């Protein structure tokens, strides 16, 4: 598929998925989020991972708060994204406790993240990551992901491959309404190892 056609298909699908997400009630988002939280906590890949990066969820994303609390409860090491808004660069920086999140400044996207001057341990320079949880707008069952168009995660996953001997396991968290028959992709798009949603097969 030509690049122009792929970009056009992505734009159309993003608009459709945003509409689907807007139609989801708060109760339904919470119901699916709690179900996915249980799936994550029972997942072998999660249980066997020590260094984990996870996104702080926006309103239209699977809620990650309980998973973050469990990461600390299990004695694992938690990293969260710090986006650079003037580029597509993102680092995963260490979070010291789940309670700390509320104290972090908010971005223009209304999500908390450590400020630029806040010096923190960065995952790739201190041993890498075992597991990365990814958000996104849409996914298919082959692991193709449609993000919001900035390229943060695709760029970061390529850096992981360069910096780590063993590639981190990547797991997307999705509402079932975000699962599509096929996601349009180009050569820059990175697949995820597993898409977790309400009806996804048990691992």
Curated annotation (Swiss-Prot):
InterPro entries: FTHF_cligase, FTHF_cligase-like_sf, NagB/RpiA_transferase-like. This is 5-formyltetrahydrofolate cyclo-ligase. It catalyses: (6S)-5-formyl-5,6,7,8-tetrahydrofolate + ATP = (6R)-5,10-methenyltetrahydrofolate + ADP + phosphate. It is an enzyme of class 6 (ligase). The lineage of its organism: Eukaryota, Metazoa, Chordata, Craniata, Vertebrata. The modification N-acetylalanine is found at residue 2. Keywords: Acetylation, ATP-binding, Cytoplasm, Folate-binding, Ligase, Magnesium, Metal-binding, Nucleotide-binding. The keyword Nucleotide-binding applies. Belongs to the 5-formyltetrahydrofolate cyclo-ligase family. It is found in: Cytoplasm. Contributes to tetrahydrofolate metabolism. Helps regulate carbon flow through the folate-dependent one-carbon metabolic network that supplies carbon for the biosynthesis of purines, thymidine and amino acids. Catalyzes the irreversible conversion of 5-formyltetrahydrofolate (5-CHO-H(4)PteGlu) to yield 5,10-methenyltetrahydrofolate. GO terms for cellular component: mitochondrion. Substrate binds at residues 56, 61, 148-152. Mg(2+) binds at residues 154, 189. Its main location: cytoplasm. GO terms for biological process: tetrahydrofolate metabolic process. Its EC number is 6.3.3.2. Monomer. It comes from the Eukaryota. Its cofactor is Mg(2+). It comes from Mus musculus (Mouse). One of its GO terms (molecular function) is ATP binding. ATP binds at residues 10-14, 145-153.
């Amino acid at each position: 598929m030509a690049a122009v056609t792929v970009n056009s298909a992505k734009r159309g699908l993003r608009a459709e998925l945003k509409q689907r997400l807007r139609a989801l009630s708060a109760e339904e988002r919470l119901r699916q989020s709690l179900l996915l939280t249980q799936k994550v906590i029972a997942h072998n890949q999660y249980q066997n991972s020590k260094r984990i990066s996870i996104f702080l969820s926006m309103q239209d994303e699977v809620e990650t708060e309980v998973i973050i609390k469990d990461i600390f409860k299990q004695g694992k090491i938690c990293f969260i994204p710090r986006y650079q808004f003037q580029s597509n660069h993102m680092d995963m920086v260490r979070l010291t406790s789940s309670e700390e999140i509320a104290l972090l400044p908010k971005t223009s996207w209304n999500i908390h993240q450590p400020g630029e001057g806040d010096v923190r341990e960065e995952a790739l320079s201190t041993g890498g990551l075992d597991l990365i949880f990814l958000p996104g707008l849409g996914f298919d069952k082959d692991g193709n992901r449609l993000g919001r168009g900035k390229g943060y995660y695709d760029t970061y996953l390529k850096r992981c491959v360069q910096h780590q001997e063993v590639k981190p396991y990547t797991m997307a968290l999705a509402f079932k309404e975000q699962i599509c028959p096929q996601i349009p992709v180009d050569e820059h798009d990175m697949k995820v190892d597993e898409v977790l949603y309400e009806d996804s097969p048990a691992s």
